[in-house]
Amino acid sequence: VTIGHARLRNVYDPTCGSGSLLLRAASIGHANEIFGQEKNPTTYNLARMNMLLHGIKFSNFRIENGDTLEADAFGDTQFDAVVANPPFSAEWSAADKFNNDDRFSKAGRLAPRKTADYAFILHMIYHLNEGGTMACVAPHGVLFRGNAEGVIRRFLIEKKNYVDAIIGLPANIFYGTSIPTCILVFKKCRKEDDNILFIDASKEFEKVKTQNKLRPQHIKKIV
């Protein structure tokens, strides 16, 4: 998300947890300001503490507590870089009111109530500025599930041309789930004839006990 920027003005994570991904992106991109939202009150407080422990001035970060999809804390603010590892296939209300929400309304369908993956993706794209880059970790299902998700996927690829790269990751690299995942990279400034880059990194790991690990050499090869 830092490519093309000598220095990011800001970086945003809508499901920031304790803030580790935010801090990493901000560090690599030399971001001036850090923004995030976290639903869990305890984790929200950890994120704020984490910022201060890493030397981020209080005036240079804004972490909000709340449900990102139900109560967006950042209105129509847009950011240079948007990163997130949202909860996989989480449930959300998919209430009728969201059909008139600018984050979701243009896609033609709402993400299903039992799989909010595309709700998070559309939310993130809404907050991405025209020259920015977004990266989101998601389950493989977002690549092929049909119905409403198929409509949204077609909107993002065919109508908007926002999908820049898809990186297939190994299974079992995240604690708590063994499902294969991917990183989706989005840009709003792509040219009409730009191709989508596909990277199969499913074999790029080292097995450590019951967990698969991405080592620096694997990350370097992917990049």
Whereabouts are the PLM-identified features?
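Class I S-adenosyl-L-methionine
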Residues: 1-33, 43-46
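A generic structural signal for alpha->beta connector loops
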Residues: 8, 31, 58-60, 131, ...
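Short, surface-exposed basic-aromatic patches at helix termini and helix-loop junctions that form
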Residues: 26-29, 53-55, 154-160
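Short, solvent-exposed loop/turn segments at the edges of secondary structure
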Residues: 29, 58, 177-179
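General small-molecule cofactor/ligand-binding pocket signal
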Residues: 35, 62-64, 167, 199
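Conserved acidic E/D residue at the C-terminus of a beta-strand in Rossmann-like folds
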Residues: 38
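S-adenosyl-L-methionine
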Residues: 46-76
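A conserved structural/catalytic subdomain of Rossmann-like adenosyl-cofactor enzymes
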Residues: 72, 76-223
